[in-house]
Amino acid sequence: MTDLTPREIVSELDRFIIGQKDAKRAVAVALRNRWRRKQLPDDLRDEVHPKNILMIGPTGVGKTEISRRLAKLARAPFIKVEATKFTEVGYVGRDVEQIVRDLVDTAIVQTREHMREDVKAKAHKAAEDRVLEAIAGTDARESTLEMFRKKLKAGELDDTVIELDIADTSNPMGGMFEIPGQPGANMGMMNLGDLFGKAMGGRTTRKKLTVAESYDVLIGEEADKLLDDETVNKAALEAVEQNGIVFLDEIDKVCARSDARGGDVSREGVQRDLLPLIEGTTVSTKHGPVKTDHILFIASGAFHIAKPSDLLPELQGRLPIRVNLRALSEEDFVRILTETDNALTRQYEALLGTEKVKVTFTKDGIHALAQIAAEVNHTVENIGARRLYTVMERVFEEMSFAAPDRSGEEIIVDEPFVTKNLGELTKSTDLSRYVL
């Protein structure tokens, strides 16, 4: 898991998300507390439970983006799910325990990757031997093998096509046992392909690959041979229990509004099912039981129609840290277009650059784009930073279409260029309502 300090986590998030200081600080402290807990003695460590977070803010202000970036920083088992995908236990659909099962599957892949790194040197040597055997044959002399080994290391044989027996990962048995009417609810049973594969010593298929292509496949295979499945699973389950993070998006969509009448199976029932999961329970998975006591839950929602107080009181109590994210202003849009590492301006420059069209954004052009986005958000519907996608796409619509014919040209995106492509639409509220 990560040992970054809260300040380092916030500065890393600042590269991609503008503003929202409170939300960044809250997730940074929560992430650092995972590390702090690991430093405690065993008896105290079990008593320290994570403080779950509820992020409240309009759409398009960075709630989901914070979760995506956090996943890369955490270096811990992380899963992002939409609360709307789940239904109450007993109804057709996925129940909330599937969240933990999916988290375990993610952790196993992640743990296997880390453990592969530890045995990479041995796996590389074994892969090299298999490639040499395929090139020189099984009964080649030592001197011949050494000659080929030198050529292999020099990269002279990279384009040579060889035939290899590769482990067949396709599953003719149709995968998991499915319960009729409940997709994804495989009850933690073992994959049939795994069962039969292990019983029969694993199936292989003969493939033609170049030497360069074969290396990745063979190193992965040889590393897996050196790894013990039981050790991988045990380490993954422990990582989930101690460091797991679940990001629950769209939590407001499972609120039963205070003025609503009648039952709704996908709303209050889902909240009730989430209670034990967040509080701490044991979930059965195909790799073994998982305790959820120390998994960190971060919930987020726009709460346009429902209010946070419409959540079940017990669920509110289990999400003690509340963070409000503010709506974005015109100044924020300017910063989003200029300061972030993945700015839309850079993306369009790179995309059209592939057609040999040079795109240059001027300061007044960026301000014009930000002003139009903020204006349409204010007059039509506030969808936050996502409005920039729409505005930019409309501005570059003609340019993107004609780019192959204008190779070698330079396009200056200034205020007149933006006004020419968008001006009329922004003046007419009726038009912008449907087009922007």
Swiss-Prot record:
Pfam families: AAA, AAA_2. It is found in: Cytoplasm. ATPase subunit of a proteasome-like degradation complex; this subunit has chaperone activity. The binding of ATP and its subsequent hydrolysis by HslU are essential for unfolding of protein substrates subsequently hydrolyzed by HslV. HslU recognizes the N-terminal part of its protein substrates and unfolds these before they are guided to HslV for hydrolysis. GO terms for molecular function: ATP binding; ATP hydrolysis activity; peptidase activity; proteasome-activating activity. It comes from Ruegeria sp. (strain TM1040) (Silicibacter sp.). Transmembrane segments: none annotated. Belongs to the ClpX chaperone family. HslU subfamily. GO terms for cellular component: HslUV protease complex. Its main location: cytoplasm. GO terms for biological process: protein unfolding; proteolysis involved in protein catabolic process. SMART domains: AAA, ClpB_D2-small. A double ring-shaped homohexamer of HslV is capped on each side by a ring-shaped HslU homohexamer. The assembly of the HslU/HslV complex is dependent on binding of ATP. HAMAP family: HslU. Keywords: ATP-binding, Chaperone, Cytoplasm, Nucleotide-binding, Stress response. This is ATP-dependent protease ATPase subunit HslU. The keyword Transferase does not apply. ATP binds at I18, G60, V61, G62, K63, T64, E65, D249, E314, R386.
